[in-house]
Design a protein with these regions (language model features):
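ATP-binding N-terminal substructure of ATP-dependent carboxylate-amine bond-forming enzymes
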Residues: 8, 15-16, 22-23, 29-147, ...
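Residue-level detector of anion-binding/catalytic polar loops
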Residues: 68, 134, 163, 224, ...
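Active-site "cap" helix and flanking loop/linker of ATP-utilizing ligase/carboxylase catalytic domains
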Residues: 254-306, 335-359
């Protein structure tokens, strides 16, 4: 009598929690097998250490009683699983598996936390798509598109309800003249690498003689340089995510840099930037920000969590789109964790919902 009741109970548990557990029968004993999740960190960019901090926060806030977590480090030399004692177990790239204690570990899903290439530009996503491993971020095409600021601007500009600043793109091996650049765009401008996961190589240019050094600086980081019209105003950034088919916005943050702009130092040095969450903006501006952010998220077919940056222009009170960050930082003091807490949620629930969407 007990055994049939137990079997029915286990089937009920599996029905209620289909995303988290698999159960089996061995030697007459039922057992639960937790989903095996790869937490992927590292990468090839200057934000390698930031990625390790992000994955540390994610690991701390995922329930080890529900998931088996495997930290996977990717760098230019190797892909490996880092065990609790610091040992390195090689990843079999043929099927994204591990050989651990004589057993083959097949990973069920990936929680990606790599900033910059290959985790933010679609390369890693393309690999996971080919071998059939679900992951928490945008797909390979959307990741590649949003990583290229110029291409993303051109696509978003077609949405109608989103303002885009004027810009010019330069290519490293294509001749250009400063005169032609200044014919298309007026000073003041920002000069930045077109494809970069960090804020390195960015300059604010207020005089013509500053333009060429700024372009040279940006070309050291990338083969493409984007020159964008400077919009004076308040920088606002908002987390957006999708759960069960519904797009949600987190409370936005205003970024107030003590530097001239939000550069690499301002981004990662304590005390250089004030981050106000939630931002002190009117209900009308908040409604516009949410609407435009959801529009961009939906039309680009984003997945998981992204962060979308805007400038609220001082003179017109219009919102200008800056960029989509498909791999926002997740360290304890990063913007998304701030916004999750401001929304009254805890990171454990938030990250768990990201995994539930793909399992």
């Amino acid at each position: 009598l007990v055994r049939p009741i137990l079997i029915k109970f286990l089937y009920l548990v599996a029905y209620i929690f289909p995303d988290n557990y698999i159960f089996g029968l061995q030697s007459g004993i039922f057992y639960f097998m937790k989903k095996k999740i790869a937490l992927i960190a590292g990468g090839y960019s200057d934000e390698y250490i930031i990625s390790l901090r992000s994955v540390q926060t994610i690991e701390k806030n995922l329930d080890g009683e529900i998931y088996d977590l495997y930290k996977i480090i990717i760098n230019r030399e190797d892909w490996y699983h880092e065990t609790a004692d610091g040992s390195q177990i090689q990843v079999d790239k043929n099927d994204f598996s591990l050989s651990l204690n004589g057993s083959k570990i097949h990973l069920d899903a990936a929680f990606i936390a790599i900033h910059g290439t290959p985790g933010e530009d679609g390369k890693l996503q393309g690999y996971l798509e080919m071998i059939g491993i679900p992951f928490t971020t945008c797909n390979s095409i959307v990741s590649a598109l949003t990583f290229n600021k110029n291409f993303c601007n051109k696509v978003v500009q077609g949405y109608g309800d989103v303002n885009i600043s004027k810009s010019v793109v330069l290519y490293k091996h294509t001749p250009f003249s400063l005169g032609s650049v200044l014919e298309h765009i007026k000073l003041h401008v920002f000069v930045k690498p077109n494809e970069s996961g960090s804020s390195l190589g960015i300059s604010k240019v207020t005089a013509a003689e500053q333009l060429l050094p700024a372009i040279d600086k940006a070309f050291k980081e990338d083969n493409q340089v984007l020159i964008e019209e400077f919009i004076e105003g308040r920088e606002l950034t908002i987390g957006v995510y999708k759960i069960k088919g519904e797009i949600h916005c987190l409370p936005p943050t205003e970024i107030i840099s003590k530097n001239e702009f939000f550069d690499y130092e301002a981004k990662y040095t304590t005390g250089v930037t004030d981050e106000v969450t939630p931002a002190h903006i009117s209900e009308d501006i908040l409604e516009q920000l949410n609407r435009k952010a959801k529009l961009v998220f939906q039309n680009l077919d984003c997945r998981g969590m992204v962060r979308i940056d805007f400038i609220l222009e001082k003179s017109s009170n219009l919102l200008y789109f800056l960029e989509v960050n498909t791999m926002p930082g997740q360290s304890e003091n990063s913007l998304i964790p701030q916004q999750v807490k401001a929304a009254g949620m805890d990171l454990k629930t938030f990250y768990g919902s990201m995994l539930a969407e793909i399992l």
